[in-house]
UniProtKB/Swiss-Prot annotation:
Originating species: Sulfurihydrogenibium sp. (strain YO3AOP1)
Family assignment from sequence similarity: Belongs to the bacterial ribosomal protein bL36 family.
GO molecular function, one term: structural constituent of ribosome
UniProt gene name: rpmJ
Pfam family, one: Ribosomal_L36
Domain of life assignment: Bacteria
GO cellular component, one term: ribosome
Keywords, alphabetical: Ribonucleoprotein, Ribosomal protein
Higher taxonomy: Bacteria, Pseudomonadati, Aquificota, Aquificia, Aquificales
The name this protein goes by in its record: Large ribosomal subunit protein bL36
GO BP: any one term: translation
């Protein structure tokens, strides 16, 4: 999980979602998981 100021999808499998008011990227590849901080 990376904490970034701006989250961007890194591949075509990445999905941008909102959880508890936070923007997150979830993906099949665990290295692509990101959370906005």
């Amino acid at each position: 999980m990376k904490i970034k100021a701006s989250v961007k999808p890194r591949c075509e499998k990445c999905r941008i979602i909102r959880r508890n008011g936070r923007v997150m990227v979830i993906c099949e590849n665990p290295k692509h998981k990101q959370k906005q901080g």
